[in-house]
Regions:
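Structural motif
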Residues: 3-4, 108, 133-134
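Short, glycine/acidic-enriched loop or turn micro-motifs at the edges of active sites
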Residues: 17-18, 81
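Generic hydrophobic alpha-helical membrane-span motif
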Residues: 20-21, 84
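Metal-dependent polysaccharide deacetylase catalytic core of the NodB/CE4 family, i.e.
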Residues: 30-126, 136-137, 145-158
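Short, low-complexity, polybasic intrinsically disordered segments
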Residues: 131-135, 140
Length: 158
């Protein structure tokens, strides 16, 4: 996969927040690339999160700005509305959350989006969800936020 090298460093950021604009400026300055995992139905919404006791802006970039903001970087699926897919009992809803987000994002960026990050952090997918995605969408890889404490590449791309 990586020629003679067998390890890689990746940068991956979730939710399509306005802070990505500054982050991308820094990445571009130093010739770095990243993947940005977006929820197409949440684009353009205001929000905030509490992190380490501080309120942090979590406002999403607007749909009409996505192509320009993320140009030169990968955009990937993060589902339409950020549900915990392994807790979503309806297989059709899992499929809708993933494939419709992929279609929406592909239209916004002008190329086929084929990557995905499961929403929710930690161990946030199961075999059922992975099989739905693998067998019914155009997604070619999906990653979890699960902490492995290992630098070993995954055997299964879903």
């Amino acid at each position: 996969m990586f020629g003679k090298k067998n390890k890689a460093v990746t940068f991956s950021y979730d939710d399509g927040v306005t802070q990505d604009i500054r982050l991308i400026e820094i990445f571009n300055k130093y010739g770095l690339k990243a993947t940005f995992n977006l929820n197409s139905e949440l684009l353009g919404t205001d929000g905030s999160l509490v992190r380490e006791g501080r309120v942090v802006n979590h406002t999403k970039n607007k749909p009409e700005d996505i192509k320009h903001i993320y140009d030169g970087h990968e955009v990937a699926v993060h589902t339409l509305t950020h549900p915990n897919l392994h807790k979503t009992e309806d297989d059709n809803e899992v499929l809708r959350q993933v494939e419709q987000d992929r279609i929406n994002l592909s239209e916004l960026v002008g190329y086929e989006v084929v990557g995905m990050a499961y929403p929710g952090g930690g161990k946030n997918c199961d075999k059922r969800v992975a099989e739905i995605i693998k067998n019914n969408t155009l997604i070619r890889y999906a990653r979890s936020g699960d902490v492995t404490k290992s630098f070993e590449p995954f055997d299964d791309l879903y």
